[in-house]
Design a protein with these regions (language model features):
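Extracellular ectodomain surface segments
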Residues: 13-94, 159-169
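Acidic, turn/loop-rich segments in luminal/extracellular domains of secretory-pathway
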Residues: 1-10, 86-154
Length: 169
């Protein structure tokens, strides 16, 4: 009887973490290199991180690959359900419900709120726009994560309208 045992390391799938961002309805959020200076207000991101989607600057909330492979973003779609929604092209704007996300292969992203879509929000209101993405280790391993952008309402300036009246004498 001949027994063959194959020894070696297989490829372990990467682990993608969910990402969050917070933005005012009339703003643009830019995230790169794990740095996010655009966060507005206070927001609890426990269990999630607010750096680029491949952020390795955090010790607890970062995308990982047990094999040490270099990670890159392979695809992006609208919606919170992984692999569904409208497919986007990396490096190009993908329109969500309340704005546009531009996600690059290196994990950096920009989200620009659509003022028209979010204008009805009052100061205390907020809505979310969710996108899902696939991260790849370049060796066949993939995992999915989401980017959830919270859009905060602002105190919109009043709009004055001209009044017209007719008086009959």
């Amino acid at each position: 009887e001949l027994k063959i045992t194959v020894l070696g390391e297989g490829n372990t799938d990467p682990v993608a973490r969910n990402d969050v961002g917070v933005i005012a309805e009339d703003s643009t959020l830019t995230v790169s290199n794990g740095a996010n200076a655009n966060l507005v207000g206070s927001y609890d991101a426990t269990g999630e991180h607010s750096g680029d989607v491949l952020d390795t600057s955090s010790t607890t909330h970062y995308d990982t690959d047990a094999d040490g492979d270099t990670l890159s973003v392979a695809s992006v779609r609208t919606g919170s359900v992984e692999g569904s929604g409208t497919a986007g092209t990396l490096g190009q704007a993908l329109t969500g419900t309340y704005g546009q996300l531009t996600l690059s292969a290196d994990g950096s992203y920009t989200y620009e709120a659509n003022q028209t879509a979010a204008d009805a929000l009052d100061l205390a209101d907020s809505v979310t726009d969710v996108f899902n993405y696939t991260v790849s280790d370049g060796n066949g391993g993939t995992d999915e994560g989401t980017i959830t952008i919270t859009i905060l309402g602002i105190n919109d300036a009043p709009v004055a309208q001209d009044d017209v009246g007719v008086i009959s004498v």
